Regions:
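Active-site-proximal helices and loops of the catalytic beta/alpha 8
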Residues: 15, 88, 93-169
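Substrate-binding/active-site clefts of carbohydrate-active enzymes
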Residues: 1-84, 106-112, 129-130, 152
Length: 169
């Protein structure tokens, strides 16, 4: 941990050495004890009892953000623009669970602060996409993510790629 001054010093030193810094950002969810839950309770998906929820059973320790809220979009974009003053790009955790249109708007606005910023999406596997969609949730494919991101993990096409290189149909 450290201060913003410490982080600025770190990124300045990274840049002095001819390197770039990509920041990992998590915009699909927060921890259940995030100050955002207390200060912006309407920004989260909730069950009938009002409890924060996630569509992924294995992720019981998170609270999914609700991108149906315009104020959330601007808050998230403002934080990206703030970080873009110091970093050269973003690795976006669980990017497919955040609407591609959000990423498109975020990229447009960040470009004003950091032209040429690098955008890396952690994508998901095909079975995960199918599961989330079967639960009524949003989950983009790699091809949709490539509309906005420079680089993706390509999880959803990996099995097809392996079959191809191994000479299988």
């Amino acid at each position: 941990v450290g201060t913003m001054e410490d982080f600025k010093h770190l990124t300045d030193e990274i840049h002095k050495r001819g390197m770039q810094c990509i920041l990992d950002v998590v915009y699909n969810h927060t921890s259940p004890d995030s100050w955002l839950i207390e200060n912006h309770p309407d920004w989260f998906k909730r069950d009938a009892q009002g409890n924060t929820v996630t569509l992924v059973p294995d992720w019981s320790d998170i609270a999914d953000l609700d991108y149906g809220k315009e104020e959330l979009w601007q808050y998230q974009i403002d934080t990206l623009k703030m970080w873009a003053e110091m970093v050269d790009g973003f690795r976006c955790d669980v990017a497919p669970r955040v609407p591609v249109e959000f990423w498109r708007q975020a990229r447009r606005e960040v470009e004003q602060v950091r032209p040429g910023a690098i955008w890396l999406a952690e994508s998901t596997e095909k079975h995960f996409i199918k599961f989330i969609r079967s639960q009524g949730g949003y989950c983009a494919t790699d091809s949709q993510l490539y509309e906005v991101f420079d680089i993706c993990y390509d999880y959803d096409i990996w099995p097809s790629f392996l079959h191809y290189v191994k000479g299988k149909d």
